[in-house]
């Protein structure tokens, strides 16, 4: 073999070659995520209490931050670690955040959670551990909400784009790719 030429990209729909139009995601209330503009999302790793939610929402309001992240369903390395407040915690968070005009970004870990979370979430987050959960990505392709995919722990850029392709090919073009850093073996 002297030379190799790729005839077809594995991520046609999300490639700038095929979709040159800049992305603009409308989250409502005049809050947009756009190409070329930095979007700040702040918040704790996990949502743990009403007091914590109120404190972080107040911080967001004081600093003109429109999006808050946090986990109500947490994938933990240890089965004994706190795994989040679940759906009831999300409902409480939504009530407090929506009163302040703050959008919610939170992780969905399995397909069965998508529908129950839908009324309370503005951006579904696919965490690093689930960035190649193809059943989850397929189902998120069918929802009319933004999806933020974090790059996998040891994932390549190509794998991140292929994960995005699953969501996009299902019809959901409201995609955010999150570069979270990776673990290498160098």
Describe every region a protein language model picked out.
Residues 38-44, 66-70, 104-106, 124-126, ...:
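Hydrophobic faces of well-ordered beta-strands that scaffold small-molecule active sites
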Residues 1-40:
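Non-catalytic terminal accessory/regulatory regions of metabolic enzymes
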Residues 50-58, 112-120, 157-163:
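Catalytic cores of alpha/beta
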Residues 38-55, 78-84, 103-107, 127-128, ...:
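Active-site mouth loops of central-metabolism enzymes
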Residues 82-106, 139-146:
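Alpha-helix-loop-beta-strand connector modules within alpha/beta enzyme cores
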Residues 33, 57-64, 95-99, 118-119, ...:
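Acidic (Asp/Glu)-rich catalytic clusters
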Residues 72-76, 130-186:
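Conserved anion-binding
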Residues 69-87:
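Glycine-rich, proline-tolerant flexible connector loops at the mouths of alpha/beta enzymes
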